[in-house]
Amino acid sequence: MNLSQLHVLVVGGATGGAATALLLARAGARVTLLEKVAQPRAVGAGIGLAENGLAVLESIGLGPAIAAHGRAVDSPAIVDGRSRLMLAPPRPTPRVRMIRRSDLQGLLLDALAAEPRVERQFGAEVIGAERDGRVTARVDGRTVEHRADLVVGADGVHSRIRTAGDFGARVRPPGIAYLRALVDVEAAQGVEAWTGAGIFGSFAVDGGTYFFASAGTRACRHAIAARDLEALRAVWARAYPPSIPLLGAVRRFDDLIFNRVIRVDCQRWVDGRLALLGDAAHAMSPNLGQGANSALVDAAVLLDELRRAADLASGLDAYQRRRRPAVQRVARAAGSMGALAEITNPVARWLRDRLLLPVAARFGGDAAAVVMQELPATLLAIGRA
């Protein structure tokens, strides 16, 4: 398919949407990017870029910048609350780079600004869409109508494109929540700890440490409801002593980011000229670190299948047939991993640690291949073609 004849409207300017806009524009498409945030700003905490996501970003020329801003995760093991090894990563260890989410977004925004075939419209909130490619947005109090050959909904868990189309979506919270923060101390353990209070992970980023912690125990919930930072520190000091310098470096309760996990599963990713990508199509538990990485893979595969196809409809059908089963496998695995990690009952934890984790260790290499979804070399080649 000749992409130079294609006008694509990408809704959502975060990681998946920005990468989609760049990939399609560099392949010849004319792209309009709508982002509801009027002024892009530093948001979020940290993000782990796995080998599949890194390959996509490297294919659009961001490899050197990510290497400069990110920090390699050498051996992302799982330990217990006393820092004893529970599960080592598979060998060879897949590449992972941890980066501040704001740094990654800044790199993508700069790349978009330098791409002449991308028109960026910030402060554009989508309020409606039709399967024939018509999209209605609100900009500065005005209603603006758009029409495109293809509309890509990369607008996240609460996607307006998904609600406008017929995707057979199921949206549900699995009952898991996390706290995240960036602190300017270098006290990262470089591991994920499965403790009596849930998960605590900490990894080095440029100029500090990114950490995340479960927020599901009764003591954690009470501390969060009361906005009591000292009580939260005490919960984690008992469960995992290496958390002490990290939570101690949090100056205000509002410096913590609180996220409830929401799962999204769609029976279809395509409805006419509307197509979903990233969390809009398949938001998952974060326990395998594949949320944003899967969105990047979506972007590359969408480009690949459109280029291969004779027409738009067949390209979109091939995209969803190639991506949906692979993402579903990863989402199920992430949900299972999250459920295992959040076990707080001592007897159930003992059984998990003695019976389930040794079995998981035996199949680590096979599991890593499933998580990657596509060969990194394939993804790299798609963007460079």
Describe the role of every protein-language-model region.
Residues 1-6, 288, 304-385:
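C-terminal helical "tail/cap" subdomain of flavin- and related membrane-associated enzymes
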Residues 60, 115, 240, 253, ...:
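Acidic-histidine catalytic/liganding microenvironments
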Residues 9-26, 30, 34-37, 153, ...:
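Conserved mid-domain beta->alpha element of the FAD-binding
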Residues 190-221, 229, 233-240:
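Active-site substrate-recognition segment that forms the wall
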Residues 128, 201, 266:
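Short, surface-exposed charged micro-motifs
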Residues 40, 92-98, 289-292:
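Glycine-rich "substrate-gating" loop/helix at the edge of Rossmann-like oxidoreductase active sites
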Residues 2-8, 25, 50-165, 169-186, ...:
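Conserved N-terminal helical subregion
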Residues 223-255, 312-313, 321, 371:
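Flavin-binding catalytic cores
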